[in-house]
């Protein structure tokens, strides 16, 4: 807001000096959220109706969606990369070749920002909603639940999870039998997208650590998987076993401790979530753990204990994981 106001004052409200803004925060309709926030600051700081009019008419704020798997710094290969470059670059970022940037804006904006002319996969579309729903549900959703299931089974890389005899079947079940059933898009289109996602998960050149995905798992589940769980229950009259197990796996991961192979389990989330899980697991009672997590409205925005059968199903999975281990529990739902 201050940047825009300074520009407005510098150019004396010249309507040709507005800016085109593409916010990149990973939230739905980020452009709409940014506009709302700017309006709030205009009011809060009493910047005036003339500036507000200039912002509305001279500037454009457009929602965007980015789709690319970016594991980050390639620690395993950095020595070879430095040797090839012949200099030290500590800002190297590993990413898959696939990329998509969807911008909800008219074609006039595309003329101002012709990224597609540079060979980049950038789409200017009337609505980002279908792209957002498809990506969040069939890429981010599986990521969120497969990661704790894989990690607690001793598997550290997404690709290895997909190729695992048991976990691979679990991922396929969640994607094709559960999450796909909740989307209102042509089935052939969804199947193609899901198969493309699996191909990306299996990328032999990208070692995507599941621990990097598990950061802030509860908020991720709330946005990526919970809507699908609710829709599936509404349409099928039963809970999706894979998504329920994914939630139980997240809760188990936040217990901490040590894996069977001796690796230390180190969850990472907001302090209030970490403290809640620590207190609940200290009771030693999976019923209290389940009801406490599902009832945490500061996580979910509601009491998930009210979803028919969910508490009992999550508790049953927690008990099974404690008694039989993760892999045997996964086998039980396939």
Task: Outline where the language-model segments fall.
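Substrate/ligand-engaging "lid" and interaction regions
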Residues: 1-334
């Amino acid at each position: 807001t201050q940047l825009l106001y300074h520009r407005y004052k510098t150019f004396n409200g010249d309507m040709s000096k507005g800016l085109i803004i593409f916010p990149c925060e990973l939230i739905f309709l980020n452009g709409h959220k940014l506009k709302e926030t700017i309006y709030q600051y205009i009011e809060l700081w009493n910047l005036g109706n003339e500036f507000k009019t200039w912002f509305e008419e001279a500037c454009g704020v457009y929602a965007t969606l980015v789709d690319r798997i970016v594991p980050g710094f390639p620690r395993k290969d950095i020595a070879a990369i430095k040797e090839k470059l012949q200099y030290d670059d500590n800002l190297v970022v590993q990413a898959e070749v696939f990329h998509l940037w969807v911008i909800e804006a008219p074609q006039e904006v595309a003329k101002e920002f012709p990224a597609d002319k540079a060979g980049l996969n950038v789409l200017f579309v009337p609505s980002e909603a279908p792209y957002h729903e498809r990506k969040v549900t069939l890429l981010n959703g599986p990521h969120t639940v497969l990661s704790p299931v894989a990690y607690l089974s001793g598997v550290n890389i997404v690709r290895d999870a997909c190729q695992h005899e048991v976990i691979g079947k679990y991922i396929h079940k969640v994607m094709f039998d559960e999450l796909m059933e909740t989307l209102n898009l042509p089935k052939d289109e969804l199947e193609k997208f899901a198969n493309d996602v699996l191909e990306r998960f299996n990328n032999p050149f990208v070692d995507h650590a599941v621990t990097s995905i598990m950061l802030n798992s509860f908020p991720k589940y709330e946005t990526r998987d919970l809507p699908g769980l609710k829709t599936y229950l509404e349409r099928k009259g039963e809970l999706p076993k894979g998504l329920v197990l994914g939630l139980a796996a997240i809760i188990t991961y936040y217990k901490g401790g040590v894996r069977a192979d001796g690796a230390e389990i180190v969850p990472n989330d907001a302090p209030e979530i970490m403290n809640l899980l620590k207190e609940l697991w200290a009771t030693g009672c999976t019923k209290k753990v389940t009801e406490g997590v599902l009832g945490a409205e500061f996580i979910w925005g509601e009491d998930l204990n009210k979803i028919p059968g969910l508490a009992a199903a999550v508790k049953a999975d927690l008990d099974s994981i404690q008694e039989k281990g993760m892999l045997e529990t996964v086998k039980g739902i396939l």
